Amino acid sequence: MHVHNAVLYHAFSGRHALDLRPGTVYWCTADPGWVTGTSYGIIAPLVNRVTMIVDEAEFDLDRWYGMIGREKVEVWYSAPTAIRMMMRAGVEAAAPYDFATLRFMASVGEPLNPEAVVWSEKVFGQPFHDNWWQTETGGIMIANRPGMAVKPGSMGQPMPGIVAGIVERDGDSVSELGTGKVGDLALRPGWPSMMRAYLHEEARYRKAFVDGWYISGDLALRDEEGYFWFVGRADDLIKTSGHLIGPFEVESALIEHPAVAEAGVIGIPDDTAGEIVKAYVTLNPGHDPSEALERDIRGHARKKLGPAVAPREIVFRNTLPKTRSGKIMRRLLKARELGLPEGDTSTLESDET
């Protein structure tokens, strides 16, 4: 549950995280039924008095590219899934189009792989700026803001006025961890768009706050320059042979292989290692599943990550299960792999094939 006072933070973060100014031609590709589509597709642009582009059709690469030039889009807010679909089409697909009016591009919904940041610089002459927030926070908390140096793979630094930390929880107490340490990503409460409750779930709401911190459920680390790096959801971590592995790290390495378009990674039980890493991948055009390609992708992953972290198994899929916001549903992959109940699938937008 959120309150109308949240509009204050939508106005502030729209201006300082997305560079929205009066008259800016702005396109947020998120569906208005998703929190990004509400907060930054409707409220933030309205209160910042921008010109909004609204496109209700499904993703179409040529229409998207053409719209940027035709409508003279200046600020573009999209999602990693769409960016990966653009990458899949190749640099050549963008060549006929004009992106000269673009001055700022941002991404949200799930972590943006480093490869996507590098690719966007080649195609658009500037990087997509990743940022991080949740439905619970109501607005952007950590961002690669305009004018900041972008570190590919990092979600940036806390917004002005937001106190973020990497913490370790011990019962009812919390201690902050130093730079380079993986822990719970936590925030000091108090910003206007913060949730006020989970509807009819008071116990769940209270559990989210410990010792003066909101515990996000995401694991991350902070580097020596104050940039935050996403590691994974606490319940997605894979424990194998004494290593604690975040799926995002493995997925990012996999999509650096020229054949791989998208990847979803899970841990499956193993008598010796505890868990082993299994990857589900979709392929770019011009590549077909084969044993030779699987070996090549596994070899690439071992070089990038080391044998302890690289996937032991790779499964080819045409599509991966995703939510409406474009997040790959790893828990669904794992439930199906292990024959477990699938749980709530109300947010499932596209299933695996």
Describe every region a protein language model picked out.
Residues 129-136, 155-158, 266-269, 315:
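Beta-strand->loop->alpha-helix junctions that form or flank phosphate-binding loops
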